[in-house]
């Protein structure tokens, strides 16, 4: 009788453990990790070498370096692209945004983490901020050191990105970048250093928050339109209008304006001096093209501060729009999407004021 009783007790204990494990697995959030390549998937010649090949390892190899994420979430990985982010392009952006929207429309998907190279991460983050149609968390993550380096920053960043994506308080924040324990909003993000692991900043507004002990602590929210409040829909788009960024500098001429238009640009963003200013020769050339229907947006080479309307440049007279706090590279992203709807400079100006 004692043996039978012991067997029954042991059986009941095992069933209870299995039930607990199963219930625990079922309650863990479901996170998709979409990999695009970049330094975070890079492979160096040695652990101490600064040289490496971006996008050399697969999503499964990359995630195997961070087994701890399996403790906090149910993870599924997909390889969307495998490139250095200097080669990021509109085709991959559209593919990525459509896949994110497809996944987030599924009730059992709780969030998305996207691994990405840091060179153009701010552009991809902003594109997704304007085209994702969900309040569920979308977090981009990268690294400044390849996966094979001593003290690689990728694994910690990936863990923090997943931890941020599973947190209920991360919903409705817009697309975010999580690196070096900072949570950075896609509406105001810039890479500020070529080497430091703390390269990303929100230069105008400051970070949305920080990651601490695997938890997000938020200190602000974006007041700009994003995700579910965005008017842009890429569902049926297969390409985006061509927009070029040209630089103003001492003695700049109309050369790059003419080249952009001849190359098929429908819009031009000027990375101007100071408050979005440019040489008279460049301004005259752009005004001429604006009258022909080319959208012109003034931005600034300077990282901090707005490019304001109506200061030195009479935007209304010239048919220009001003980018306000959006830097030239993110301004290009917004202008491409704006041109899918209109080329009216006043309507484009509204968008640059709201996003």
Residue ranges and their predicted role:
Residues 11-22:
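Bacterial N-terminal signal peptides
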Residues 141-212:
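Internal gly/pro-rich beta-alpha loop/helix module
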Residues 125-156, 162-166, 291-300:
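Short, acidic/small-residue loops that bind anionic groups at enzyme active sites
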Residues 25-102, 328:
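ATP/NTP phosphate-donor binding region
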Residues 2-13:
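Bacterial N-terminal signal peptides that target proteins for export
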Residues 275-355:
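C-terminal non-catalytic interaction/assembly regions of soluble proteins
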Residues 114-136, 278-287:
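Short Gly/Thr/Asp-enriched flexible loops that form oxyanion-binding sites at enzyme active sites
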Residues 28, 34, 58, 62-69, ...:
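Accessory alpha-helical/coil subdomains and C-terminal extensions
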């Amino acid at each position: 009788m004692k043996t039978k009783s012991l067997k029954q007790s042991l059986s009941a204990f095992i069933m209870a453990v299995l039930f607990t494990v199963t219930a625990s697995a079922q309650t863990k959030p479901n996170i998709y990790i979409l990999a695009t390549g970049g330094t975070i998937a890079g492979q160096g010649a040695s652990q101490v070498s600064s040289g490496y090949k971006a996008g050399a390892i697969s999503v499964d190899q990359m995630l195997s370096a961070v087994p701890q994420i399996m403790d906090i979430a149910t993870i599924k990985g997909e390889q969307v692209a495998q490139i250095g982010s200097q080669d990021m392009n509109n085709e991959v952006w559209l593919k990525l945004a459509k896949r994110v929207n497809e996944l987030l429309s599924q009730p059992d998907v709780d969030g998305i983490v996207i691994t990405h190279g840091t060179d153009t991460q701010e552009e991809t983050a902003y594109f997704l901020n304007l085209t994702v149609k969900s309040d569920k968390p979308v977090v981009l993550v990268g690294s400044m050191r390849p996966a094979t380096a001593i003290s690689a920053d990728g694994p910690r960043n990936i863990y923090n990105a997943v931890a941020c994506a599973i947190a209920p308080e991360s919903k409705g924040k817009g697309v975010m970048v999580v690196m070096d324990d900072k949570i950075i909003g896609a509406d105001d993000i810039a890479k500020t250093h070529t080497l430091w692991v703390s390269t990303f900043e929100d230069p105008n507004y400051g970070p949305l928050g920080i990651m601490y002990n695997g938890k997000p602590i938020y200190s602000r929210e974006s007041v700009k339109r994003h995700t579910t409040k965005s008017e842009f829909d890429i569902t049926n788009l297969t390409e985006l209008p061509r927009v070029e960024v040209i630089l103003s500098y001492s003695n700049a001429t109309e050369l790059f304006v003419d080249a952009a238009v001849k190359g098929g640009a429908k819009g031009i963003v000027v990375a101007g001096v100071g408050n979005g200013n440019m040489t008279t020769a460049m301004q005259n050339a752009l005004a001429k093209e604006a009258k022909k229907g080319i959208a012109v947006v003034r931005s600034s080479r300077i990282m901090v501060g707005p490019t304001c309307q109506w200061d030195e440049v009479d935007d209304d007279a010239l048919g220009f729009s001003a980018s306000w706090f959006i830097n030239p590279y993110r301004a290009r992203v917004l202008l491409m999407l704006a041109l899918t709807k209109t080329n009216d400079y006043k309507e484009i100006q509204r968008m640059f004021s709201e996003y």
